[in-house]
Curated annotation (Swiss-Prot):
<feature type="binding site">
    <location>
        <begin position="7"/>
        <end position="12"/>
    </location>
    <ligand>
        <name>ATP</name>
    </ligand>
</feature>
<dbReference type="GO" id="GO:0005737">
    <property type="term" value="C:cytoplasm"/>
</dbReference>
<keyword id="KW-0547">Nucleotide-binding</keyword>
<dbReference type="InterPro" id="IPR043129">
    <property type="entry name" value="ATPase_NBD"/>
</dbReference>
<keyword id="KW-0963">Cytoplasm</keyword>
<dbReference type="GO" id="GO:0005524">
    <property type="term" value="F:ATP binding"/>
</dbReference>
<dbReference type="GO" id="GO:0004340">
    <property type="term" value="F:glucokinase activity"/>
</dbReference>
<keyword id="KW-0418">Kinase</keyword>
<comment type="similarity">
    <text>Belongs to the bacterial glucokinase family.</text>
</comment>
<dbReference type="GO" id="GO:0005536">
    <property type="term" value="F:D-glucose binding"/>
</dbReference>
<keyword id="KW-0067">ATP-binding</keyword>
<protein>
    <recommendedName>
        <fullName>Glucokinase</fullName>
        <ecNumber>2.7.1.2</ecNumber>
    </recommendedName>
</protein>
<dbReference type="Pfam" id="PF02685">
    <property type="entry name" value="Glucokinase"/>
</dbReference>
<keyword id="KW-0324">Glycolysis</keyword>
<keyword id="KW-0808">Transferase</keyword>
<dbReference type="GO" id="GO:0006096">
    <property type="term" value="P:glycolytic process"/>
</dbReference>
<dbReference type="InterPro" id="IPR003836">
    <property type="entry name" value="Glucokinase"/>
</dbReference>
Length: 342
């Protein structure tokens, strides 16, 4: 058994986990702690405190940390922290010979292989091809995209900035949304991330509200107004995207329901765009924090219709397996599996 250290490092919260991996690549969780990232000047003292508290007889041989941000030449700077991480320094100061830093969405790609059947909800079984590419897409704070290609006996994960590709409206309402966003932000183009993300849910809500396409309820109106008044502030006291999503799931707010319908349609269409580019018959996995929270809406929506509505390419997309990842610790699992490869 090899002892591994896995970390999921965010600007607000960091989760550390000690894992043992068997010869059959089975993961066994040993110890886990969650920390407020801002309470520490650097990752090193946090890990040192964690290892002391874990009180284990042996020391991790390998470590991998998933970072909420870009990783360049084995270094990373987190947006909301003063931390600057470098694998060479971390290895020296933590006495862990093998350390890797990976983007948090790349960690999701690795984590797919550590999921169980109950960690997934299959929207479309398709016709799985074991040697084919795998695609991942995930709406959360932004819109992550990536893909995996099989190389030998293992898959290699490739990150992508596909979320910053252009939003492509497909009907009159979406064209109106595009023009609304162009005018509102005085910009020349709209990325798909501005629509398919947590911020996108709010933008769609504002569009429907300002165009008076549905009546606004006092409860959600108050949340959105508070958020709008706090624009530009580092700390916000409300999460309008979550409030809109919850109201839509509960069926308590018609404007929120319409906003989520438009959001899910655009999400399905963009997932289909990614699928067209990669033909991921190994599966397309929907990650991110939003999908699991709005499952009833997705299951009873036109997500798959919009996913597959690609003209004469529709029969190809009908054969691609589509899964929603329910396990929100998939990134931490991926970091552990990535560490095992070092």
């Amino acid at each position: 058994m090899t002892l591994l250290l896995a970390g999921d490092i965010g600007g607000t919260k960091t989760i550390l986990r000690l894992v043992e991996i068997s010869n059959s690549s089975e993961l066994h969780n040993i110890y886990e702690e969650s920390y407020q990232s801002g309470d520490f000047p650097d990752l090193v003292p946090m890990v040192q405190q964690f290892l002391v508290k874990a009180n284990i007889p042996s020391h991790p041989e390998k470590a991998c940390f998933a970072i909420a941000g870009p990783v360049v030449n084995n270094t990373a700077k987190l947006t909301n922290l003063v931390w600057f991480l470098d694998t060479e320094r971390l290895a020296q100061e933590l006495s862990i010979p093998f350390i890797s830093l990976i983007n948090d969405f790349a960690a999701v790609g690795y984590g797919i292989f550590g999921l169980n059947k109950q960690d997934l909800l299959t929207l479309q079984a398709g016709k799985h091809q074991p040697e084919a590419p795998i695609a991942i897409i995930g709406a959360g704070t932004g819109l992550g995209q990536g893909f995996l290609i099989k190389q030998g006996n293992q898959y290699q994960v490739f990150p992508s900035e596909g979320g910053h590709a252009d939003f492509a409206p497909r009907n009159e309402l979406e064209f109106q949304l595009l023009k609304y966003l162009l005018d509102k932000h005085d910009i020349q183009r709209v990325s798909v991330e501005r629509v398919v993300s947590g911020q996108g849910i709010v933008a769609i809500y504002q569009f429907l509200r300002d165009r008076k396409l549905a009546t606004e309820s006092p409860e959600i109106a108050q949340v959105v107004r508070t958020w709008e008044q706090q624009a530009g502030q580092a700390e916000k006291t409300v999460d309008p995207g979550a409030a809109i999503g919850k109201a839509a799931v509960q069926g308590s707010d018609r404007l929120s329901e319409q906003a989520l319908q438009l959001f899910i349609d655009a999400y399905g269409a963009e997932a289909g765009n990614l699928a067209l580019k990669l033909l991921p018959y190994g599966g397309l996995y929907i990650a991110g924090g939003i999908a699991p929270k709005i499952l009833p809406l997705i299951e009873n929506s036109n997500f798959l219709l919009n996913f597959s509505q690609k003209g004469r390419m529709r029969p190809l997309l009908a054969e691609i397996p589509v899964h929603i990842i329910l396990n929100q610790q998939v990134g931490l699992i991926g970091a552990a599996l990535c560490a095992a490869r070092l």
